[in-house]
């Protein structure tokens, strides 16, 4: 019983804190959608900041990937247009 008795003592303050925090957050979101939207925008801003600092290499890699993606759809579209035009001419 000693093993079973120890974890509840450790877990109870965490569970109590989680129970206290979650109803407040849920009530705030239900009461004010503007505040919830403000939290989302703040989260987006914080997420963007590290992305701006880090990816010099990612910025270089992105332009290389985009032209390849741009060329492929153009190659796919061109034969389709030619097939459509041919019956019209006939």
From Swiss-Prot:
Residues 11-90 have a biased composition (Basic residues). GO terms for cellular component: nucleosome; nucleus. It is found in: Nucleus; Chromosome. InterPro entries: H1/H5. Coiled coil: none annotated. The keyword Lyase does not apply. Keywords: Chromosome, DNA-binding, Nucleus. One of its GO terms (molecular function) is DNA binding. Its main location: nucleus. Residues 1-90 are annotated as: Disordered. One of its GO terms (biological process) is nucleosome assembly. This is Histone H1.M6.2. It comes from Trypanosoma cruzi. It comes from the Eukaryota.
